[in-house]
């Protein structure tokens, strides 16, 4: 049975008039017009072919060695004295049983003037720069593609809207001027690094205008470095026992971090002080399932070791609330930040959904989630939910009308697309955060 591939992420423009959605290797654009009317505004697909790129690389190498090979061929003879001619090297290609190749699109960000959209593509480990034209039939136009040696994992855009900070899978951080011309071969040196995979990055400044880069990694570290003098480490924030998957920054130097621990950490990143921790383990317990059982080789005799991790933590822009979700669960947890005691966190609300949450994002004072709705019966729905703050009720509520109309817009936009309408077994892996957890084998 074929289904529409679940949405992997959402990004909304400042005024809410544009929404970008990631499905597999595509970015879909939608215009939102009140009341609750959606209009499809184009699609961009990453058609980069890894196998073809491998062929091109091999061809260049062969061409460079052709003259040398011709000379050597004259000297090669068989046992009968016949000349032996070298054969061209085989082009590497996936063989039988090779793992599938997934061309994820990640890390959607808009520049502050919203004239450009920045994203990352796994296909060629690149940073994508799009022009955004709201008057065009297809609002996105790919302008540049900066390729890296390792996969970009997280990005942050500087206030000048031209500098992008990229953290990669290898542990290095780079600074790219998106107005520059992309190099054919990546030669840039990193501006700072970790000895572990980077998971998040933020470029921020203090009240004196000094800039800092905050990075988190798989080795439970949070590092604060001066920018652009990144060789100067300002401080480390120690306290996590497991990997850090997500960080977010608030006013007055507040930093929130989460990951493989069963706690949310609140910090004053300027002083390095751990302000508080919020233990959410009892709150999430009713939502855990078989997907949270530890891998068999790390289980006990009773097979009851549970492992879970926060996939994303994000702050409301104007309200004192922060939301997060645990991977492979059907809820988001909203916390209230104390206005009297900096860093104090208290439970505000838990919102449940019919399917597992895949992604969490924020637009002003609205939270948005995408759901793993591949098991939806009948007409597929529940692709995403838009969650608004109701001042009268002093609580967050799902805007069902807006969400339902968005479902209809998604269905109409992908009709006849054999790439986005796929078999269930061909859906991209949607739960990757838990793989960051280290076990005994990583320390041996």
Curated annotation (Swiss-Prot):
The modification Phosphoserine is found at residue 93. Transmembrane segments: none annotated. It is found in: Nucleus. Forms a heterodimer with the catalytic subunit TRM8. Disulfide bonds: none annotated. GO terms for cellular component: cytosol; nucleus; tRNA methyltransferase complex. Keywords: Nucleus, Phosphoprotein, Repeat, tRNA processing, WD repeat. Required for the formation of N(7)-methylguanine at position 46 (m7G46) in tRNA, a modification required to maintain stability of tRNAs; its absence resulting in tRNA decay. In the complex, it is required to stabilize and induce conformational changes of the catalytic subunit. InterPro entries: Trm82, WD40/YVTN_repeat-like_dom_sf, WD40_repeat_dom_sf, WD40_rpt. Residues 55-92 are annotated as: Disordered. The keyword S-adenosyl-L-methionine does not apply. It comes from Saccharomyces cerevisiae (strain RM11-1a) (Baker's yeast). Pathway: tRNA modification; N(7)-methylguanine-tRNA biosynthesis. GO terms for biological process: tRNA (guanine-N7)-methylation. SMART domains: WD40 (SM00320). The gene is TRM82. This is tRNA (guanine-N(7)-)-methyltransferase non-catalytic subunit TRM82. Belongs to the WD repeat TRM82 family. WD repeats lie at residues 1-47, 48-99, 100-147, 148-192, 193-237, 238-279, 308-354. Residues 71-85 have a biased composition (Basic and acidic residues).
